[in-house]
Amino acid sequence: MSMQSPVSVQLAPDSASTMVNCTIKSEEKKEPCHEAPQGAAPAVETQPGDPALASQDATNAKAPPQDCASPESSGSPEPKRPAASEAASGSQERLDFNRNLQEVVPAIEKLLSSDWKERFLGRSNVEAKDVKGTQESLAEKELQLLVMIHQLSALRDQLLTAHSEQKNMAAMLFEKQQQQMELARQQQEQIAKQQQQLIQQQHKINLLQQQIQQVNMPYVMIPAFPPSHQPLPVTPDSQLALPIQPIPCKPVEYPLQLLHSPPAPVVKRSGVAAHHPLQEPPQPLNLTAKPKVPELPNTSSSPSLKMNSCGPRPASHGAPTRDLQSSPPSLPLGFLGEGDAVTKAIQDARQLLHSHSGALENSPNTPFRKDLISLDSSPAKERLEESCVHPLEEAMLSCDMDGSRHFSESRNSSHIKRPMNAFMVWAKDERRKILQAFPDMHNSSISKILGSRWKSMTNQEKQPYYEEQARLSRQHLEKYPDYKYKPRPKRTCVVEGRRLRVGEYKALMRTRRQGARQSYTIPPQAGQAQVSSDILFPRAAGLPLARPLVEHYDPQGLDPNMPVIINTCSLREEGEGTDDRHSVADGEMYRYSEDEDSEGDEKSDEELVVLTD
């Protein structure tokens, strides 16, 4: 028996060993093979440690599942079908497992231990020993494998879904970025279009402003009409007869008719034609002087009075009463406002005129002052350009009202005027209206009236003038970007070692003149009046005086301590006589300049004053 047992094993290796291997394979698939012969099983059990058998088992374990089918066909026919079906299903599961394993190996390696591969592929001895275990252990292992397969498949599905979600999110983010970039580009295009439209609109506005300025550039001078409200005839040559529309302040009715009339010269001049107002260039408004439009000689008695104002005449005459009648006191004052301050200022001005004329009438030695109120102030430039026929006519033109100074219109070309403020814009037209109604009203009275009216106006009424002020300021800044306001210094003069201002100097001279008048012994004659007016009141354009008139004046009667103001223009034109030269040489010469006042009127650059002690 002992000799036959190994022989039987060696002789029938194909039958017994294959059946054992089939049994092992069936145990792995939860279907153990019980049809093995009884003689083969003890043979395997009696020699468990045989190396030949172990190697054979190892080779049979790696054999394909079709090897089990051939020995099973020779065995009993009962388990043939279940074994074949289980082998086919096992091979299919292994193929699926290998395919899934290749896909999810990187994720599995992180979850399992390092020796899982050897255990799973059966390369370790422990796996070989486990394979030979019981049916319960094999079933448990297979159950664990199935659970792991399901977990791996679920993990694979999760990874796939996460990957697809990431792709979708990336696509959505890219689309959002594209949309944002498109919106930003559209916004930039819209902003560029709007900026271009704004630039075009600004250009159009500038063009319109230039056109408006060109239309409103020439100032139309309104003539001062006589007190008789008769409309003057209009010639067909005057194509500019348009109603002047001032800036609206208060809706009032104006009784005067704003019509243009051809002017007539006041005095006949040789070789000089009468200037038509349509041919004159537009000139800035002189706020202190009266309008330069000449009056018709047949409409008022003031020209005839002006002819006799500075000439030789008897002492007793009725000129002041006629001059006062020339100013229209009966005009309605509706356009001047309804306030008490306005009417009070006008009444004060009239009382001042009456008192001044009465004082001049009572003083016998100053007949030349009686008609100074009714004289118009004409520019010195026109007087110098025009040739005079008679010295008395030129003297009439050169007399100024109440000693007021005349300034030449030809200022320095580099002088830049300041832009007008809101009050000046409003007062420009209002001053014209007041001068039309009251040609003889003094500038100070007009300023009081305008100031009281401006204070009584509301902010809503002042708003358009403030807007005009802003427009003029912008225009001035564009025209003169480097302009800087430099006020002129105050006028001062040194008298007897003291530096006095102009007001103090005038007050001092006034008191000294009043004291000097009392010491005069010369009878009041026209010649003396002419000389004294020329000496005491300097004029912008002096006239050569006749020698008998100069000799008629006695300088010995003056106070020796009183400085006398001598007109230097008349000194130059008289040929510089000996007495005058000595007075200029012995005297002190001072130059003082006029500071700009608030009304923006024209002033002379410098005035030469010669003081002799």
Swiss-Prot record:
Protein name (Swiss-Prot/TrEMBL): Transcription factor SOX-13
GO BP terms in the entry: gamma-delta T cell differentiation; negative regulation of canonical Wnt signaling pathway; positive regulation of brown fat cell differentiation; positive regulation of gamma-delta T cell differentiation; regulation of DNA-templated transcription; regulation of gamma-delta T cell differentiation; spinal cord oligodendrocyte cell differentiation
Provenance organism: Mus musculus
Region of interest (Required for homodimerization), ranges: 77-336
Subunit field text: Homodimer; homodimerization reduces DNA binding efficiency. Interacts with isoform 2 of TCF7/TCF1 (via N-terminus); inhibits WNT-mediated transcriptional activity. Interacts with HHEX (via N-terminus); abolishes the SOX13-mediated inhibition of WNT-mediated transcriptional activity via competitive inhibition of the SOX13-TCF7 complex.
Classification via InterPro entries: HMG_box_dom, HMG_box_dom_sf, SOX/SOX-like_TF
UniProt keyword Repressor present: yes
Tissue specificity field: Expressed in beta-cells in pancreatic islets of Langerhans (at protein level). Expressed in a subset of invariant natural killer (iNK) T-cells (at protein level). Expressed in oligodendroglial cells in the spinal cord (at protein level). In the hematopoietic system, expressed in gamma-delta T-cell lineage, specifically in immature Vgamma2-positive gamma-delta thymocytes, with expression decreasing upon maturation. Expressed in DN1d cells, a subset of DN1 (TCR, CD4 and CD8 negative, also known as TN1) thymocyte progenitors, and in DN2 (also known as TN2) thymocyte progenitors.
Gene3D superfamilies according to UniProt: High mobility group box domain
Residue ranges, compositional bias (Basic and acidic residues): 25-34, 572-593
Feature: DNA-binding region: 416-484
GO molecular function, one term: DNA-binding transcription repressor activity, RNA polymerase II-specific
Function: Transcription factor that binds to DNA at the consensus sequence 5'-AACAAT-3'. Binds to the proximal promoter region of the myelin protein MPZ gene, and may thereby be involved in the differentiation of oligodendroglia in the developing spinal tube. Binds to the gene promoter of MBP and acts as a transcriptional repressor. Binds to and modifies the activity of TCF7/TCF1, thereby inhibiting transcription and modulates normal gamma-delta T-cell development and differentiation of IL17A expressing gamma-delta T-cells.
The keyword Transcription belongs to this UniProt entry's keyword annotation: yes
Summary of the knockout phenotype: Mice show severe growth abnormalities. Severe reduction in the number of Rorc and Vgamma2-positive mature thymocytes in fetal and adult mice caused by the loss of Blk expression in Vgamma2-positive immature thymocytes. This results in a severe reduction of Il17a-producing Vgamma2-positive gamma-delta T-cells in the spleen, lymph nodes and dermis. In addition, the number of Vgamma4-positive thymocytes in the fetal thymus is transiently reduced, with levels returning to normal in neonatal and adult mice.
Region annotated Disordered, chain positions: 1-95, 276-329, 572-613
Compositional bias ranges of the Polar residues kind: 15-24, 297-307
Gene: Sox13
Cellular localization per UniProt: Nucleus; Cytoplasm
Transmembrane segments: none
Chief localization: nucleus
